[in-house]
């Protein structure tokens, strides 16, 4: 086969033109489309990568916030638990304190009621004993008993000290002194109309029953020895006296009787009961204040 050079050149030129045409009108759009697609994919991948990074950052922030929230929740839960526990303890202590105060108040009230009842029983018992004693003495009072009372009165006068004798003398003559030697001797207000116009002191001695002459003489002697002066005596009977003797002189009266003992005993018992009641009330107030 003969090779024509022109034909070869023409074929080569034709081939080159075909290649250029293919590249210009066929391959270039395809390549451009491929490049554009590749660029779009790369852009989308870059955007996706950015979004992924943002998502990871957001996830990290979310997890961090969750951790912080959990920590704050634990702290708040611990704080609230401690506060609730402390409040519960405070309320329990307050309840126990209130219960103790109520119990103490109830016990004190019961103790006061018991003490009041006990004091009332004591007072009633003492009053009954004293009343019975007075009644018995009034029923048993007689001449023999009056003689013994006179002897007791004489012994008491003879055992007075100098100061007591001086006080008794002043009480009988001038009046106005306080009785400090015995609860059985009582100085009463002046009795109007007693005295002697002759200047000699007159002493009136009275008892529930008439005293024998011997007892009258003994009393007169003891009183003269006590007063150290001349006096006159009038002895009389006073039915209202219970086992006792009273002397009236210089406008004053000095009395000695078993009734005086009973009155002193009653006064002492009343004083002791009042003092005991005041002590109990003071202790109750101190306990309440301490609470």
UniProtKB/Swiss-Prot annotation:
> What keywords are annotated for this sequence in UniProt?
ATP synthesis, Cell inner membrane, Cell membrane, CF(0), Hydrogen ion transport, Ion transport, Membrane, Transmembrane, Transmembrane helix, Transport
Q: Kindly provide the name given to this protein in its UniProt entry.
A: ATP synthase subunit b 2
Where is it localised? Cell inner membrane
Q: Which GO terms describe its molecular function?
A: proton-transporting ATP synthase activity, rotational mechanism; proton-transporting ATPase activity, rotational mechanism
Instruction: List S-S links within the chain.
Output: none
Name the domain of life this protein comes from: Bacteria
For this protein, the record's Pfam families field holds: ATP-synt_B, OSCP
Query: How is this protein situated with respect to the membrane?
Result: Single-pass membrane protein
Task: Tell me the protein family, please.
Answer: Belongs to the ATPase B chain family.
Q: Which organism is it from?
A: Nitrosospira multiformis (strain ATCC 25196 / NCIMB 11849 / C 71)
Which InterPro entries does the UniProt record give? Alt_ATP_synth_F0_bsu, ATP_synth_b/b'su_bac/chlpt, ATP_synthase_B_chain, ATPase_OSCP/dsu
């Amino acid at each position: 086969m003969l090779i024509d050079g022109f034909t070869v050149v023409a074929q080569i030129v034709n081939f080159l033109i075909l290649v250029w045409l293919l590249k210009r009108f066929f391959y270039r759009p395809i390549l451009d489309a491929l490049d554009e697609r590749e660029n779009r994919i790369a852009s989308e991948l870059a955007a996706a990568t950015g979004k992924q990074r943002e998502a990871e950052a957001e996830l990290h922030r979310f997890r961090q916030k969750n951790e912080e929230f959990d920590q704050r929740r634990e702290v708040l839960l611990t704080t609230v638990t401690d506060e609730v526990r402390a409040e519960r303890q405070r309320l329990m202590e307050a309840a126990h304190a209130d219960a103790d105060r109520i119990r103490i108040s109830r016990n004190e009230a019961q103790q006061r009621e018991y003490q009041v009842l006990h004091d009332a029983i004591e007072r009633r018992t003492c009053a009954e004993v004293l009343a019975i004693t007075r009644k018995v003495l009034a029923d048993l009072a007689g001449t023999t008993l009056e003689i013994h009372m006179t002897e007791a009165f004489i012994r008491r006068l003879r055992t007075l000290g100098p100061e007591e004798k001086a006080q008794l003398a002043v009480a009988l003559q001038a009046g106005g002194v306080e009785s400090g030697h015995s609860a059985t001797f009582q100085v009463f207000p002046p009795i109007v109309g007693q005295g002697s116009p002759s200047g000699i002191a007159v002493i009136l001695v009275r008892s529930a029953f008439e005293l024998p002459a011997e007892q009258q003489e003994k009393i007169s002697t003891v009183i003269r020895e006590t007063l150290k002066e001349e006096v006159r005596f009038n002895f009389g009977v006073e039915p209202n006296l219970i086992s006792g003797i009273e002397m009236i002189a210089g406008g004053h009266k000095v009395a000695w009787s078993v009734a005086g003992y009973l009155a002193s005993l009653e006064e002492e018992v009343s004083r002791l009961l009042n003092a005991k009641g005041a002590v109990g009330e003071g202790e109750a107030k101190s306990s309440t204040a301490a609470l």
